[in-house]
Regions:
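Conserved, structured core segments of small domains
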Residues: 1-97
C-alpha cells in the first residue's frame, strides 16, 4: 500500500529541526528496518521558498501499523519538531505519474 504522511512543524522548531536533520535523514535511509520504503520525501517550505515548516513523505508499506511505527520513531517526532497531534497518515491510490 502507498501512504502519505503530512507533518507540520511547531512554530518555533527551526533550530530543533536543524539540530536533528542528520538523524532524520539517517532514519529515512534506514526505513527498511520498519518495513517501509520511502518513495519520496521533503520539507514543506514557507512562502520565502527556503524556511522549512513541515514534512511530506510518500511511502510504501504493508499496513498502517508499519507507517505509524516509522513515524513515531523519526527524530523529528521524538525530539518535538512536529506539532503534537499534527501528523496525518493517509492511504493513497496513485492514479497518474
Amino acid at each position: 500500500m502507498i501512504f502519505v504522511i503530512h507533518a507540520m512543524d511547531k512554530k518555533d522548531a527551526i533550530n530543533t529541526r536543524a539540530k536533528h536533520y542528520k538523524a532524520h535523514r539517517q532514519h529515512l535511509d534506514d526505513s527498511e528496518k520498519y518495513g517501509v520504503g520511502v518513495i519520496t520525501a521533503g520539507p514543506f517550505v514557507a512562502d520565502d521558498n527556503e524556511t522549512p515548516i513541515g514534512s511530506l513523505f510518500i511511502i510504501e508499506a504493508k499496513d498502517r501499523a508499519a507507517v505509524k511505527a516509522f513515524v513515531e520513531s523519526d527524530p523529528y517526532h521524538t525530539n518535538g519538531v512536529w506539532e503534537a497531534g499534527g501528523v496525518e497518515i493517509h492511504a493513497y491510490h496513485k492514479k497518474r505519474g
